[in-house]
Amino acid sequence: MQQLKTKYNDQVRPALMQQFGYSSVMAVPRIEKIVVNEGLGSSKEDSKAIDKAAKELALITLQKPIITKAKKSISNFKLRQGMPVGIKVTLRGERMYVFLEKLINIGLPRIRDFRGINPNAFDGRGNYNLGIKEQLIFPEITYDMVDKTRGMDITIVTTAKTDEEARALLQSMGLPFRKQ
């Protein structure tokens, strides 16, 4: 599962150095971390929903998720401060590359009517956000283990200064962007 990291070091980094004219290898953008987040609004009624979602996310990312809690009480949402509202995992290093490779090669092609990911989902600082509607696209999750389909947000944090640099990095890493 070192293919993506090897590809970055051998092909992507030299190509980006030439394309953007970096003087140092350390100036070339790289992927810093990947944050996978699941918001669980239904956890207020069903206390086991967080446990089930955490188990599924741990299978997908190979890392135990942390439970995120509400910062403020909001009476309209029947939400109290400190109530669990979601789960998240921050992937770095080896696990990050394993997850990204799994997402590119297995997960994204299994999405129904997939024509590529949105090329405009950059935040202006070189980070990319991707929303996935169901967790069934990952091979670790079978249809039998799922009680409810849950979506997730995937944020790819890069060291790129601009969106153009980040897009070039992610495109050369193999992320299939939609043609505009």
UniProtKB/Swiss-Prot annotation:
Transmembrane segments: none annotated. Pfam families: Ribosomal_L5, Ribosomal_L5_C. The keyword GTP-binding does not apply. Keywords: Ribonucleoprotein, Ribosomal protein, RNA-binding, rRNA-binding, tRNA-binding. GO terms for cellular component: cytosolic large ribosomal subunit. PANTHER family: 60S RIBOSOMAL PROTEIN L11-RELATED. Belongs to the universal ribosomal protein uL5 family. Forms a bridge to the 30S subunit in the 70S ribosome. Part of the 50S ribosomal subunit; part of the 5S rRNA/L5/L18/L25 (CTC) subcomplex. Is known to contact the 5S rRNA, 23S rRNA and the P site tRNA. NCBIfam families: PRK00010.1. This is one of the proteins that bind and probably mediate the attachment of the 5S RNA into the large ribosomal subunit, where it forms part of the central protuberance. In the 70S ribosome it contacts protein S13 of the 30S subunit (bridge B1b), connecting the 2 subunits; this bridge is implicated in subunit movement. Contacts the P site tRNA; the 5S rRNA and some of its associated proteins might help stabilize positioning of ribosome-bound tRNAs. This is Large ribosomal subunit protein uL5. It comes from Deinococcus radiodurans (strain ATCC 13939 / DSM 20539 / JCM 16871 / CCUG 27074 / LMG 4051 / NBRC 15346 / NCIMB 9279 / VKM B-1422 / R1). The gene is rplE.
